[in-house]
Amino acid sequence: MKIMQSVTQLREALAGQTSVGFIPTMGFLHEGHASLLEQARQENDIVVLSIFVNPTQFGPNEDLDRYPRDEQRDQQLAQAAGVDYLFYPTNDVMYPLDMARVTVRSGDDVLCGTSRPGHFDGVLTVVSKLFNIVQPTRAYFGLKDAQQLALIEGYVTDYFVPVEIKRCPIIREADGLAKSSRNVYLSETERKQAPGIQQALQQAKQALDAGTPLETVLEQTRASLHFEGTTIDYVEAVAYPTLGPVDATTDTILLAVAVQFESARLIDNLLYTRGA
């Protein structure tokens, strides 16, 4: 595995490669990232992993400065997963002039976009830059960040980016908690409460299977997510991947939640296909 910070150096290394699988991350890697790397390794000749804590996707009161970092551990996991090139750009590399950014026109007015204004502009800006640098054949994203994934798919379509976006399943702890770099923030009590998010989503699925109206399911889910010391950011259902309102013609529904614990904000979701 080679570690690089230079755009020119990485482009030269990738020139002429038949297929390149790419996983963009902010580091502090876990088993969820490892599953993306494993799939990329199986499907491509070359695997590129980027680690960059992107400042433009953090709001003024968010956790940019304390976002967990562990370069040595990340490098070990990347090496074990068979990564060929680990791209470690600096802010100056990624934002040399910072004169232009991507702006999201739709799909950021629901779910995380409501409480994190500008977040997805930052995400799509950095993803756009990384796609231009790496020029991958395939890029891998986890469904845990389902809204982000849908917006990236939309960006790729709107901008005619020649990359195949691969949706990858959510990887969970044994008790159902979705793997996340931010789980490390949780106190012991919060860690015991957190699996209740997935439990609430599974109860919602069972209710939908039984024919319970969607609005009733959302109300029931909100009621089941009232953990001590937490606030509910949202419990919403949107059509997927359009992120528009659910109506009678909607085949796939994204049921998504965000819960603010004292130590961390956790998100989770499920995709529900009507009639499946």
From Swiss-Prot:
Subcellular location per the Swiss-Prot or TrEMBL entry: Cytoplasm
A biological process from GO: pantothenate biosynthetic process
Positions annotated to bind beta-alanine: 57
EC number(s) reported in the record: 6.3.2.1
Active site: 33
Keywords: ATP-binding, Cytoplasm, Ligase, Nucleotide-binding, Pantothenate biosynthesis
One Pfam entry name: Pantoate_ligase
GO molecular function (one): ATP binding
Coiled coil: none
Subcellular location, principal: cytoplasm
GO cellular component: cytosol
Sites where the protein binds ATP: 26-33, 142-145, 171, 179-182
InterPro entries: Cyt_trans-like, Pantoate_ligase, Pantoate_ligase_C, Rossmann-like_a/b/a_fold
Catalytic activity line of the entry: (R)-pantoate + beta-alanine + ATP = (R)-pantothenate + AMP + diphosphate + H(+)
Pathway linked to the protein: Cofactor biosynthesis; (R)-pantothenate biosynthesis; (R)-pantothenate from (R)-pantoate and beta-alanine: step 1/1
Binding site for (R)-pantoate: 57, 148
Note in the entry: The reaction proceeds by a bi uni uni bi ping pong mechanism.
Family: Belongs to the pantothenate synthetase family.
Function summary: Catalyzes the condensation of pantoate with beta-alanine in an ATP-dependent reaction via a pantoyl-adenylate intermediate.
Record's subunit section: Homodimer.
Protein name per Swiss-Prot or TrEMBL: Pantothenate synthetase
Lineage start: Bacteria, Bacillati, Bacillota, Bacilli, Bacillales
Gene that this polypeptide is encoded by: panC
